[in-house]
Amino acid sequence: MEGLLLFSPAPYVRTNLVGLVPFASLFFEWLRTPEEAGGGTTAFRYRTLPMTGLVAYCDTMDHAEEALEKPYRKPVLTVLSEFDSIVDTERMLEAADESFLNPRSRTIWYGDETPETKVMKVISLPSHLEKEHIRSFSHLSVNFSPENPHYGRGARAEWCRPENDPRPRFYCEIPESEIWYGAWGEERDGHVYVRLTYNPHFERQTEEVLAFLRGK
């Protein structure tokens, strides 16, 4: 292995409840059962969550945290979104800045401000794109082209229902011109937001990844 590509890595998350997962798994098989999930599930969107999957994720997180406590000297490219609703990206960037010691290591950061780092090179790209009605990026969006048939522009029918909202038709019937996109689905600032599932900077990101792989 000559290096790492990390897209929205999640050894750190924005909740303190993760530590309770191993204990809770002794009493519950599902965090959200298929019956509770209701509508909104598609081939490209999960709404059920078994506890065994969460336990496996927590175990992976623990190993990743241990690894980040040690210096890593091969090049690493990390992709993070400032407003990720799940991943604690500020903490992840801080850990990367301290542990990824290769001078070729870098982070592509989607956000409103360029974070300060000691060593890590940061390529900052804006996540607030007014003309495209985009306020912030989700961890899912960084991986997909706007042309992707399932996650790209025009694929809102797969994702138009914000989590836990009982009115899926309401969101699906809103004209495209009135929809905004962000790290999660919600209503605020007078706008209806649905989760952004594609990356408007996908071509630029691809260029950066290819340059990294070529040793530049």
Regions found by a protein language model. Give the residues of each.
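Active-site nucleophile loop of the alpha/beta-hydrolase fold
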Residues: 5-17, 25, 31-32
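Serine-hydrolase catalytic core
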Residues: 45-190, 194-214
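Generic structural signal of hydrophobic/aromatic residues within well-ordered alpha-helices
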Residues: 20-27, 140, 209
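Short, proline-centered helix/strand-breaking motifs
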Residues: 9-11, 22, 50, 75
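A structural motif
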Residues: 24-39, 45-50
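Short aromatic-enriched loop/helix-cap "lid" or pocket-rim segments at secondary-structure transitions
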Residues: 16-20, 90-91
